[in-house]
């Protein structure tokens, strides 16, 4: 179903396709934990990261190696011919000749789709500015499936909903599962109107609030995001909203016992470390789930 296919946006996937990816990820979880595999032996994955990354870069690299493949890295833009003025299109054409697939993270929205236009091999979007982050969304859905439930879910997306690409992608995907979505943010960091409009047209129930206390006792999942400092054109505005939400043990009094707290990481001040040891915290398991999910994508796209 995904053979030789680009992974650019969650809007490109049906629920049936997502379910197949999640089922494949579950079957690969033992391999993600160390069981050997050689199904992608001889395949090469190119990692092109023009923005900082820890989890996405390392989990893709781990996923490829767990499947018996290898990776090559661009390094930084400053250390490549891009620093000499080479266009992204030309760089993609060249790298596509060295690898069987390309993972790209870039600060400009639409960059992954542009890369796909010129690439001779499949392109996987690892984040394009404030646009989309589909592989993060797939691991988020896998986490929700493992730790809670996907159907009839009540979820609060909290924090920077304007610049946070993870919540943009996740909102679209959740609409396929009939979720009730609460959007919790400062007024200046609201979810873009286009996305809210798209969700409404898809029949998704969406409610916007600024006070997390209004919804924290009602939801099954809290999806917390950091304020995206690097996206702010004005540092004064960033400082004004930087500590808008910070979850502590006290905030969890009276919540559902089965509440699960997620975060795409890295966190800054959004979740107190005291929450880490509660039954509600699943964000470190969430980070691990990136390995089997990305293994599933690579297997489905590249396996002969």
UniProtKB/Swiss-Prot annotation:
<dbReference type="GO" id="GO:0016597">
    <property type="term" value="F:amino acid binding"/>
</dbReference>
<dbReference type="InterPro" id="IPR002082">
    <property type="entry name" value="Asp_carbamoyltransf"/>
</dbReference>
<feature type="binding site">
    <location>
        <position position="226"/>
    </location>
    <ligand>
        <name>L-aspartate</name>
    </ligand>
</feature>
<comment type="function">
    <text>Catalyzes the condensation of carbamoyl phosphate and aspartate to form carbamoyl aspartate and inorganic phosphate, the committed step in the de novo pyrimidine nucleotide biosynthesis pathway.</text>
</comment>
<feature type="binding site">
    <location>
        <position position="55"/>
    </location>
    <ligand>
        <name>carbamoyl phosphate</name>
    </ligand>
</feature>
<feature type="binding site">
    <location>
        <position position="84"/>
    </location>
    <ligand>
        <name>L-aspartate</name>
    </ligand>
</feature>
<feature type="binding site">
    <location>
        <position position="266"/>
    </location>
    <ligand>
        <name>carbamoyl phosphate</name>
    </ligand>
</feature>
<dbReference type="GO" id="GO:0005829">
    <property type="term" value="C:cytosol"/>
</dbReference>
<dbReference type="GO" id="GO:0044205">
    <property type="term" value="P:'de novo' UMP biosynthetic process"/>
</dbReference>
<feature type="binding site">
    <location>
        <position position="136"/>
    </location>
    <ligand>
        <name>carbamoyl phosphate</name>
    </ligand>
</feature>
<protein>
    <recommendedName>
        <fullName>Aspartate carbamoyltransferase catalytic subunit</fullName>
        <ecNumber>2.1.3.2</ecNumber>
    </recommendedName>
</protein>
<dbReference type="Pfam" id="PF00185">
    <property type="entry name" value="OTCace"/>
</dbReference>
<comment type="similarity">
    <text>Belongs to the aspartate/ornithine carbamoyltransferase superfamily. ATCase family.</text>
</comment>
<dbReference type="InterPro" id="IPR006131">
    <property type="entry name" value="Asp_carbamoyltransf_Asp/Orn-bd"/>
</dbReference>
<dbReference type="InterPro" id="IPR006132">
    <property type="entry name" value="Asp/Orn_carbamoyltranf_P-bd"/>
</dbReference>
<comment type="subunit">
    <text>Heterooligomer of catalytic and regulatory chains.</text>
</comment>
<dbReference type="GO" id="GO:0006520">
    <property type="term" value="P:amino acid metabolic process"/>
</dbReference>
<comment type="pathway">
    <text>Pyrimidine metabolism; UMP biosynthesis via de novo pathway; (S)-dihydroorotate from bicarbonate: step 2/3.</text>
</comment>
<feature type="binding site">
    <location>
        <position position="165"/>
    </location>
    <ligand>
        <name>L-aspartate</name>
    </ligand>
</feature>
<dbReference type="InterPro" id="IPR036901">
    <property type="entry name" value="Asp/Orn_carbamoylTrfase_sf"/>
</dbReference>
<feature type="binding site">
    <location>
        <position position="56"/>
    </location>
    <ligand>
        <name>carbamoyl phosphate</name>
    </ligand>
</feature>
<feature type="binding site">
    <location>
        <position position="265"/>
    </location>
    <ligand>
        <name>carbamoyl phosphate</name>
    </ligand>
</feature>
<dbReference type="GO" id="GO:0006207">
    <property type="term" value="P:'de novo' pyrimidine nucleobase biosynthetic process"/>
</dbReference>
<feature type="binding site">
    <location>
        <position position="105"/>
    </location>
    <ligand>
        <name>carbamoyl phosphate</name>
    </ligand>
</feature>
<dbReference type="InterPro" id="IPR006130">
    <property type="entry name" value="Asp/Orn_carbamoylTrfase"/>
</dbReference>
<keyword id="KW-0665">Pyrimidine biosynthesis</keyword>
<dbReference type="Pfam" id="PF02729">
    <property type="entry name" value="OTCace_N"/>
</dbReference>
<feature type="binding site">
    <location>
        <position position="133"/>
    </location>
    <ligand>
        <name>carbamoyl phosphate</name>
    </ligand>
</feature>
<dbReference type="GO" id="GO:0004070">
    <property type="term" value="F:aspartate carbamoyltransferase activity"/>
</dbReference>
<keyword id="KW-0808">Transferase</keyword>
